[in-house]
Every structure is written in structure tokens, then in C-alpha cells.
Amino acid sequence: MNIIAQLEAEQCAKIAAKRQLPAFQPGDTVRVMVRVTEGTRTRVQAYEGVCIARSGGGLNETFTVRKISYGEGVERVFPVYSPLIEGVELVRRGKVRRAKLYYLRNLRGKAARITEKKDQRKKSAKIVEKEQEALVRVEAPAHATE
């Protein structure tokens, strides 16, 4: 590993220790908390939209978020390790089959919607829970008759 890559890895680890970003990918709807400075005041502004791309690696990694503001499409590119990003919230997971969703730029209205990804782990956990409840109900009358 060369010296530059080693320094980048150390910086990434240091920044990641301060703030944890959720694991998100293109197609996910995210809310990015951005620190905005206006004159002497600083505030945190939320920018919510669909992540349409992730690119780069190491310290140079970025993600692009697209939203529709007053009927106009707005895209913003955020560096993952930027000090201006306070945090990222995952609003919902999207089901897509592409890494770059640039085709969304040409779609309008309902055609630009992304279906929500169903989480199989939650579903299987609910099924297991229901089966356990059913077993408890079946076993309970047998103990009551003894």
C-alpha cells in the first residue's frame, strides 16, 4: 500500500469515527443534513431526494442526490467525507437494477417513481414470530388439561 493511499485511509477512518453514515446505494431516498453558512450565521439544512449515483473511492467518494423543487429537477453532488455534511438519514430503500440512475432525468411524474425494496429479514422475522405464537397457543391447552 503506497503512502498516499495509507494517508487517505487514515483520514477516512478518522472522519468515519466522528460521524456514521448509513449504508445507502443508488435508488434510496436519503435526507442529507448540510451545514449552510449565511454571513455570520450557520444552520443545518435538510436536502431530501433520491440518490442517483455513487462514484469515486477513498476521500474522493461522492454521491449525487436528485430532487424536484417547485417543478424543476435539482441535482447536488456531495462528497461523502465533507465536513459540511452533518449526517445522512435513510428515508426509504429503493429497488433498482442500475448503479447510475441518470435516466431519471428524462422521466416526469409517476414514471420517475422508484418502487420500495421489501426487506426480507423483517418479513422472515415476522413469520418466525407468528409461528412461535401459534406453537405457544397449541401447547397452552395441553398444559391446562393436566
From Swiss-Prot:
Which Gene3D superfamilies does the annotation name? Answer: 2.30.30.790
Entry GO terms, CC: cytosolic large ribosomal subunit
InterPro entries in alphabetical order: Ribosomal_bL19 (IPR001857), Ribosomal_bL19_CS (IPR018257), Ribosomal_bL19_sf (IPR038657), Translation_prot_SH3-like_sf (IPR008991)
Q: Name one Pfam family in it.
A: Ribosomal_L19
* Recorded family membership: Belongs to the bacterial ribosomal protein bL19 family.
Q: What does this protein do?
A: This protein is located at the 30S-50S ribosomal subunit interface and may play a role in the structure and function of the aminoacyl-tRNA binding site.
Protein name from the UniProt record: Large ribosomal subunit protein bL19
